[in-house]
Amino acid sequence: MTRVFLDINVILDVLANREPFADEAEAVLRQVEARAIEGLVAAHTITTLHFLLAKYVGKAKVRKVLTDLLHVVRVVPVDEDRIRHALAMNWTDFEDAVQAACAEKAEAEYLVTRDKRGFKKSPVKIVTPAELLALVL
């Protein structure tokens, strides 16, 4: 099974229905839900999603949404080793470096994001949601 690491922007596109990106991101999550591919997210993605979405939909609803998401994806730890590795990568965007470091540790085949420029030096192959769908469908 193809193992993919999902950047937070892909999840946000679905949960916040951000057009014009939501449809492709949702199609990726449907593939994860159908177990056609294995979806991974960093632990801090869950806390960041809660922070970003709670003010728009309320804490109760965001907890339900995140609980549902956790039935679909596997959470990858963000530990000291990953933080040190991300710091050593010396990227401009530290959060992107942490995502890439987590994807690498989890042995993901692809890191799925709309921000390909932010991941130019990624140790894991970067694809957009559309590119991933073309590969797996």
Task: Give residue ranges: language-model regions.
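General small-molecule cofactor/ligand-binding pocket signal
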Residues: 40, 76, 127
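Acidic catalytic patch
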Residues: 17, 44-45, 65-90
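Acidic, PIN/NYN-like endoribonuclease modules and their adjacent C-terminal/linker elements
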Residues: 3, 72, 101-137
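Short, well-structured N-terminal submotif of metal-dependent ribonuclease cores
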Residues: 1-41, 54-64, 121, 130-137
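Short active-site oxyanion
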Residues: 34-39, 74, 107-109
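Alpha-helix capping/helix-boundary segments
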Residues: 10, 45, 82, 99, ...
